[in-house]
Swiss-Prot record:
Gene Ontology CC entries for this record: mitochondrion; peroxisome
Biological-process GO terms, alphabetical: fatty acid beta-oxidation
EC category name: lyase
Protein name: Mevalonyl-coenzyme A hydratase SIDH
Motif (PTS1-type peroxisomal targeting signal): 278-280
Pfam family of the protein (one): ECH_1
Superkingdom in the source lineage: Eukaryota
Entry EC no(s): 4.2.1.-
Record InterPro entries: ClpP/crotonase-like_dom_sf (IPR029045), Enoyl-CoA_hyd/isom_CS (IPR018376), Enoyl-CoA_hydra/iso (IPR001753), Enoyl-CoA_hydra_C (IPR014748)
Predominant subcellular localization, coarse grouping: other
Pathway: Siderophore biosynthesis
Gene knockout outcome: Does not affect conidial germination, sensitivity to oxidative stress and iron-starvation, nor virulence.
């Protein structure tokens, strides 16, 4: 395809254009379950901005290589930072665009063009935050979803909490986020999170591309304006503002405390965390 400007370089990510007007973004850290390290967030944000600005593109598909869509943040990186006495968590070494772009450049993105999440496997933490920000979710039957942050002493502070509450209601959102449970694709479909499930043996990316092709066949102007109208109902209270209020307030206290460091360290060491009483 010919573009007005070439796409930006993004590490550990494959960019392809398998059919007209469609961008496919594949997170490619399969050994790390496509966990996203800090330097990758602004790079992905730049890619989504390029996608919005490129006139020839009408729909994007996000997926992961291997057995995971995205397992969230790179907690090994966090643990290494903590061991070196450096800030860990979302605020450490954060790009200024984090509040408006979020995890993977997507979880707080408003943008103007649609993104379909092709969830091929594990979709946890920040991966779940990205999926919830997508316009539609096509999932493999074996995919698993969850926000397990509370089990490791961190918080889903990239936009998922207000969005999840709007999609599934406070009680179900509380069940997922406060208990840290994971859920099968079929249950997520029954909750209204997942649009379509691809049966075992099928290709979730191929199915997402069929959806993307159908969308790309519509008027690009109508799609952009219709999506803007949908977001007007979706974000009556801006999740970006909600995220910033938490992020710039109580979350800083959490980052400075012992429990986040212990949670990340215990995860890397594959042991149960030993929590301290909260001082928040």
């Amino acid at each position: 395809m010919t573009f007005t400007k070439q796409p930006p370089a993004v590490h550990d990510t494959d960019i392809s254009f398998p059919q007209p007007h469609v961008l496919v973004v594949t997170l490619n850290r399969p050994k790390a379950f496509n966990a996203i390290p800090r330097p990758l967030h602004p790079q992905l944000a730049a890619l989504w901005a390029w996608y919005d600005a490129e006139p020839s593109l009408r729909c994007a598909v996000l997926t992961g290589a291997g057995k995971a869509f995205c397992a969230g943040a790179d907690l090994k990186e966090w643990n290494d930072k903590a061991a070196a006495g450096q800030a860990i968590g979302a605020a450490g070494e954060r790009d200024p665009s984090w509040a408006t772009s979020g995890f993977g450049g997507l979880s707080n993105r408003r943008g103007k063009k649609p993104v379909i999440a092709a969830v091929n496997g594990l979709c946890l933490g920040g991966g779940m935050e990205m999926a919830l920000a997508a316009d539609m979710i096509v999932a493999a039957a074996a995919a698993r979803f969850g926000l397990p942050e509370v089990k490791i002493g961190v918080v889903a502070v990239a936009g998922a909490l207000p969005r999840l509450t709007r999609i599934v209601g406070r009680q179900r959102a509380s069940e997922m986020a406060l208990l840290g449970r994971t859920y099968a694709a079929e249950e997520m479909r029954s909750w209204g999170v997942v649009n379509h499930i691809v049966p075992e043996g099928g290709s979730v990316v191929d199915e997402a591309l069929r959806w993307a092709g159908e969308l790309a066949g519509n008027s690009p102007d109508s799609v952009i304006v219709t999506r803007a109208g949908l977001l007007g109902g979706w974000d009556p209270v801006d999740p970006v503002k909600s995220t910033q209020e938490i992020d710039e307030g109580i979350y800083k206290l959490l980052e400075a405390g012992e429990n986040q460091k212990e949670g990340v360290k215990s995860f890397v060491e594959k042991r149960r965390p030993v929590w301290k009483d909260s001082k928040l």
